[in-house]
């Protein structure tokens, strides 16, 4: 080997030979040589950098902090009573359940090591992981799970989750095993099992709504509360949280979180612009678009919400005529609503099932016809149905009836009232609908109400012709509440007051169908029936809008159903990162 290097060395010019060669160059030749050397150096450096990059990957590092801004004030930071968005956001960070919804939309074990389901779908048995702890260091046991579920089921607790647990019993098999027994199969039960678990030792003996742990929570989730700042009035300004290094799915990468609370959206936006918070959600599309235009990073995901016009045939007889609803569906410019009102943070829909409902293959019934063609179709439908535009510019219909050899003529007006909330998006949508329908000769009036008044004075007594309204469909079983005939009257949510015996049977069967393929077929049949009967005109599904830090990695909101779902995989988020070669990343 030494002889080899000596031979190579003898082939290279010596220092004196190189000096002699360089001294023989002219000034111009020296400059060319220097230039060539510089080009070679830069080229070599670039090649080395590119090779290095091709072998490098970015990996998350533990550490860093994140400040999140939220509108509202938390009051019940516990999974049994959480009501507001602020409550639910903190609850999702502090608590964990037997299962957790993963970013794919499927459910994975969380506190549970495993679970089994009986063949008849009536029994779910969960086995807890070893060495699982609450933030104060006490172990999580089967007793804590049973205590939490019984608190939810207790009518005196008035938990908003109670209806999900009616008819379900829970029993302790041993210290690590819990069994749930159902009266009938329930395809959404694994979602029930995501409810956060309370430490029984802290909550026992005190009325749940009065316990100090409502604002000083201790759970087993990815983050634990380390501090709270309150105003002199007792209103909470912010919470500080730290990663829980015994979280069963792994210690979170981000070390510290601060959740800051603001009374309204304007104050929230000011905090973002002033750098007091890094991230915010729940903004109107208009404000989100303004922030996007000045460089903020926005992530969005379509929510399982169905906004539409729901018709009350009992109050407005014109809606018993399907031709009228068919014409309305053609005439309403849904694309314009999504573009102008939602700023494209949403999608148009034609069906009662949200476009991103898991495991449901949407029927593609979109058309490629132009707006002008749709208007012509709408007018043609109404003309064929006997509606004629009068001198006042609106449609009228004259019908002739004979009774006892006497002929009677009566004239109907194609006029109705849209009732809706006073939220900006609803008001703007209602005005576009009115403009679209006026264009084809319908006379439309709009009545807007404060949301609470809309519910009490309009929705509950069913006093409306057409209701511009949104349905929140977190899972398939919610469709029962919105479309089964048993839910037509208050407190039911069937605001279209829809009745169809076939649909009732489909929804009843779907609730107890565990096999996913069969359940999907049933919901496809349900959708066919709704589209045939046309009890509503479906308009759009809005998106969840999230302004996030540009340094944030690991966020996945593709399958969220509620705003707090954005934190489902927060333990995988990171704000600190480094580059290493691929071979060292495993």
Predicted features along the sequence, with ranges:
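Aromatic- and charge-enriched surface segment that lines or borders ligand/interaction sites
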Residues: 2-11, 113-158, 179, 318-320
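Detector for C-terminal structural segments
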Residues: 49, 331-364, 424-434, 457-586
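A structural "hinge/loop" feature
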Residues: 53, 72-88, 111-112, 138, ...
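N-terminal lobe/hinge region of extracytoplasmic solute-binding protein
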Residues: 69-119, 150, 218
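Surface-exposed binding/hinge segments that line
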Residues: 161-205
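Gly/Pro-rich hinge or "lid" segments in bacterial periplasmic/extracellular proteins
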Residues: 194-256, 266, 274, 375-384, ...
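Append "and occasionally in soluble cytosolic enzymes with long acidic Gly/Pro-rich linkers
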Residues: 229, 235-243, 321-435, 525, ...
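Ligand-site clamp/hinge motif
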Residues: 244-290, 434, 443-445
């Amino acid at each position: 080997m030494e002889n080899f290097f000596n031979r190579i060395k003898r082939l290279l010019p010596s220092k004196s030979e190189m000096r002699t060669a360089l001294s023989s160059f002219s000034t111009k030749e020296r400059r060319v040589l220097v230039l060539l050397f510089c080009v070679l150096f830069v080229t070599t450096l670039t090649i080395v950098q590119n090779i290095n990059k091709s072998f490098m990957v970015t990996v998350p590092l533990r550490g860093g902090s994140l400040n999140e801004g939220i509108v509202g004030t938390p009051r019940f930071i516990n999974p049994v009573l959480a009501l507001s968005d602020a409550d639910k956001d903190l609850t999702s960070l502090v608590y964990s359940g037997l299962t957790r919804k993963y970013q794919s939309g499927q459910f994975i074990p969380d506190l549970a090591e495993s679970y089994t389901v009986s063949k008849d779908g009536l029994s779910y048995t969960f086995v807890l992981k070893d060495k699982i702890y609450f933030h104060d260091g006490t172990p999580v046991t089967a007793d804590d799970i049973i205590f939490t579920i019984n608190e939810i089921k207790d009518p005196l607790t008035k938990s908003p989750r109670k209806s999900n647990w009616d008819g379900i019993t829970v029993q302790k098999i041993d210290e690590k095993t819990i069994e749930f027994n159902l009266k009938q199969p329930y395809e959404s039960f694994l979602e029930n099992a995501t409810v956060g678990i309370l430490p029984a030792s802290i909550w026992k003996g005190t009325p749940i709504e009065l316990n100090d742990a409502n604002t000083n929570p201790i759970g087993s989730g990815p983050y634990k509360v380390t501090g709270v700042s309150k105003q002199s009035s007792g209103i909470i300004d912010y919470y500080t949280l730290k990663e829980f290094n015994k979280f069963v799915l792994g210690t979170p990468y981000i070390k510290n979180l601060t959740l800051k609370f603001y009374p309204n959206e304007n104050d929230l936006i000011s905090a973002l612009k002033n750098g007091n918070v890094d991230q915010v959600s729940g903004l109107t599309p208009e404000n989100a678009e303004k922030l996007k235009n000045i460089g903020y990073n926005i992530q969005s995901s379509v929510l399982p919400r169905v906004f539409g016009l729901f018709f009350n045939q009992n109050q407005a007889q014109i809606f018993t005529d399907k031709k009228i609803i068919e014409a309305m569906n053609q005439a309403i410019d849904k694309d314009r609503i999504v573009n102008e009102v939602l700023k494209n943070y949403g999608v148009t829909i034609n069906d009662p099932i949200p476009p991103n409902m898991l495991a449901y293959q949407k029927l593609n019934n979109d058309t490629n016809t132009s707006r002008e063609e749709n208007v012509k179709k709408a007018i043609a439908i109404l003309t064929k149905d006997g509606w004629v535009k009068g001198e006042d510019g609106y449609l009228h219909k004259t019908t002739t009836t004979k009774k006892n050899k006497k002929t009677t003529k009566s004239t109907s007006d194609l006029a109705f009232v849209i009732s809706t909330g006073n939220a900006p998006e609803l008001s703007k949508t209602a005005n576009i609908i009115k403009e679209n329908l006026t264009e084809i000769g319908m006379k439309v009036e709009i009545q807007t109400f404060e949301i609470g008044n809309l519910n009490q004075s309009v929705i509950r007594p069913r006093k409306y012709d057409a209701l511009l309204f949104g349905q929140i469909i977190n899972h398939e079983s919610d469709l029962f509440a919105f479309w089964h005939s048993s839910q037509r009257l208050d407190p039911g949510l069937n605001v279209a007051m829809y009745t169809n015996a076939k649909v009732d049977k489909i929804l009843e069967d779907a609730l107890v169908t565990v096999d996913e393929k069969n359940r999907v077929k049933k919901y496809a049949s349900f959708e066919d029936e709704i589209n045939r009967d046309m009890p509503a005109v479906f308009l759009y599904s809005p998106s969840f809008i999230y302004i996030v830090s540009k340094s944030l990695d690991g966020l996945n909101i593709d399958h969220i159903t509620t705003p707090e779902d954005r934190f489902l995989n927060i333990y995988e988020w990171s704000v600190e990162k480094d580059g290493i070669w691929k071979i060292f990343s495993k």
